[in-house]
Amino acid sequence: EHLDAALAKGKGVILLTGHFTSMELGGRLIMLKKPCYVMFRQLNNLLFNAVMMKFRTLHSEGTVLRDDPRPMVRALKKNKIVWYAPDQDFGPRSSVFATFFGVTAATVPATARIVKMSGAAVIPFVPRREKDGTYTLSLGEALKDFPAGDDVDDAQTINDLIEREVRIAPEQYLWIHRRFKTQPGEEKASLYKKGRSGFSRE
């Protein structure tokens, strides 16, 4: 309902999600009903990168690389859907600082900027595994008054949206992505430390 209403406006839809454990399954399921373009970040592991790229290209309408958002804007202007998960730490150069669960987190302002360029609607999309083993796909109402015009405020809006969904089932969020790795100013030292099994909070 919300997705169809947004598409009826003819300016494309950003299907905004977070890095949940069922995000790949959720993306595949939604694309059985609605073809989507997929935003993809190149991975350091070349083999895994090739596998992921092949999978997403095979099951999507097209793949958009994070380093070049122009194809994403073009797709939106053609009233297409773009599946996008912006909740990763890409370092200080491409981010602003907003809070996530009360902790400062480097947050990309790209969502708001792309909406400004395209006029697209932003629809929250959350795949979730239920207690009975089934999966639900939640499509929310398009964000209102977004973007507001300030990069930090707009980044906070996105973080708050994802945080609300994570709180419903925090065990289904991919915390392994080290969301709080980059910190500003005097807090620049990482909040993570190396351990025998990887990284953990201090």
Regions found by a protein language model. Name each.
Residues 1-2, 45, 65, 108:
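Alpha-helix initiation/capping motif
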Residues 9-67, 78, 89-99, 103:
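Catalytic core of membrane glycerolipid acyltransferases/transacylases, capturing the structured
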Residues 1-11:
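Nucleotide-sugar donor-binding and catalytic loop/hinge architecture
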Residues 5-7, 32-35, 67-202:
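Non-catalytic C-terminal accessory region of glycerolipid acyltransferases
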